[in-house]
Regions:
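Transmembrane signal-anchor hairpin modules in multi-pass inner-membrane enzymes, especially those
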Residues: 1-96, 113-127, 195-209, 252-265, ...
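Alpha-helical transmembrane segments of multi-pass inner-membrane proteins
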Residues: 26-30, 49-51, 82-83, 123-167, ...
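Membrane helix-loop boundary segments at the extracytoplasmic
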Residues: 29-38, 226-229, 354-357, 388, ...
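Long extracytoplasmic/lumenal interhelical loops at the membrane interface
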Residues: 294-308, 312, 316, 320-357
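Hydrophobic alpha-helical transmembrane segments
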Residues: 358-372
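A membrane-periplasm/extracellular boundary helix in multi-pass inner-membrane enzymes
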Residues: 138, 144-147, 224, 242-296, ...
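Membrane-interface helix caps and helix-loop-helix hairpins in membrane proteins
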Residues: 87-96, 173, 223-228, 412-417
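Membrane-embedded alpha-helical segments of multi-pass membrane proteins
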Residues: 38-58, 98-107, 181-189, 232-239, ...
Length: 441
């Protein structure tokens, strides 16, 4: 009976077009990030996952899904989160957060299965992401230049002059929040790196120049959000990018001195342009300086107070945490918080994971990130047993490393990463690695 049903489904029009349907849903998920509420994104991610599971059960595919080490690590993380759920004193509230985590992890596995069968969809997907990023960046720059009204108290203005107040752009993402926009744009910043290097490798210099300009626009838009956590993300993103460029130039050309002068001038002009933009904007300079203000800045002082309370929560629940979800966090945080410092989260991704699911969940998540980066480095730097690794595969690995470093760097100072707009884009990026069927020496 099962075989008859399976044969019927495999010969159907639906089965012949299932990958196209799944891809359309994925593009809808990416599109919904810029204009719809989080619930719609979650529903689309769940629909994508259900159809992928249906495909895996009933529709024949050419190759089996390869369960890599980082897939195992994130599964261990999820199992620990499940234990944390059943150990939570507020099960119903924690269950709400658990369902979100379940959808994210399920979506990651299903996206991995999708890209395993559809490697040709990687570049179009990254192109689509870059289009969304560019549109949001242009909107953000317009908002900054026209002076948008603040939706909430986003900046400490007690010790700065009116001309030093940043008009913090927030784009169209919902809920309106400049930190959310910054996290979203930062997560997609590496998409431009992939496209620039990919087109350069094909000697399509004019197209690469176009995406270089869009990269700078995206960079300026992130700066215009005034998000200091994103600025910290830059400290992880750009050193890694520069090291990769130096490594490539040294290997390909024998050193920077052998690069043509016009390419050096273009790079120098881009760097000078961004520095000029920052140095001629006193509001941005003041915003950068405030990072080092610590207790003298009310926003940073608020975060430090939340950190102190969250650390106490972790120390009281070190192994399984309090249970996942910001509703659960807020209820228990009230027992620890300093008066007047209410919060929905700990404002630090590693601390949030430790508080919600315990030290073992944090170790499993860090192991997951380590294994992803390790796989990317091995793929990018070594040859495989079956022959030559494609250049675009190496570039993809670099872009994913940059994405992880940038978002996790931002995550040291904020928990925007847990928002669907950032989280789903994060998982889509990493799931692309499943398309690389490479055996490393």
């Amino acid at each position: 009976m099962y075989s008859r049903i399976k044969n019927f489904i495999n010969n159907s029009l639906f089965a012949n077009n299932i990958d196209n349907i799944l891809y359309m849903i994925m593009l809808l998920i990416l599109s919904s990030a810029v204009c719809l509420k989080s619930d719609y994104m979650g529903a689309l991610a769940l629909l994508f996952s259900i159809l992928t599971i249906f495909k895996s059960i009933f529709i024949q595919t050419k190759e089996k899904f390869e369960f890599k080490n980082y897939h195992k690590a994130i599964l261990i993380f999820f199992l620990i989160v499940t234990l944390s759920l059943f150990g939570s004193t507020l099960f119903s509230l924690s269950f709400h957060g658990y369902i979100k985590t379940f959808i994210y992890i399920l979506f990651f596995y299903c996206s991995s299965i999708f890209f395993k069968d559809n490697k040709n969809k990687i570049t179009p997907t990254i192109l689509f992401v870059s289009f969304l990023m560019s549109a949001e960046s242009i909107i953000a720059i317009i908002q900054n230049n026209t002076g948008v009204l603040e939706i909430s108290g986003w900046q400490d203005t007690t010790s700065i002059n009116p001309e030093e107040v940043v008009s913090r752009a927030y784009g169209t993402l919902q809920p309106y929040n400049p930190n959310l926009l910054a996290g979203y744009l930062l997560c997609g910043l590496s998409s431009f790196v992939y496209l620039i290097l990919n087109f350069l490798s094909k000697n399509k210099k004019k197209i690469a120049l176009l995406f270089s300009i869009l990269f700078l626009i995206n960079l300026i838009a992130i700066i215009d959000t005034g998000c200091r956590g994103a600025y910290l993300g830059f400290l992880f993103f750009f050193p890694c990018l520069f090291l990769a460029i130096i490594y490539y130039v040294q290997k390909k050309f024998g050193g920077i001195s052998n690069i043509k002068k016009r390419y050096k001038n273009i790079t120098l002009a881009g760097v000078i342009g961004v520095l000029f933009f920052i140095l001629t904007n006193p509001a941005l300079i003041k915003r950068f300086e405030s990072i080092l203000a610590f207790r003298e800045d009310s926003s940073i002082s608020f975060r430090l107070n939340v950190y102190e309370s969250a650390i106490k929560m972790f120390l009281d629940n070190p192994f399984l945490g309090i249970g996942v979800g910001n509703q659960n966090f807020r209820e228990i945080y009230g027992l620890y918080m300093k008066t007047g410092f209410d919060a929905l989260g700990s404002y630090c991704v590693p601390l949030e994971i430790a508080v919600e699911s315990g030290i073992f969940a944090l170790i499993a998540f860090i192991l997951f990130l380590f294994l992803v980066i390790k796989f990317c480095l091995e793929t990018g730097l070594k040859k495989d047993r079956t022959g030559k690794i494609e250049t675009k595969d190496r570039i993809l690995c670099l872009s994913i490393i940059l994405m992880i470093l940038a978002t996790m760097g931002h995550g040291l100072f904020d928990t925007i990463w847990f928002r669907p707009q950032v989280q789903l884009l994060f998982w889509i990026n990493i799931s692309m690695l499943s398309a690389l069927k490479i055996k490393i020496k």
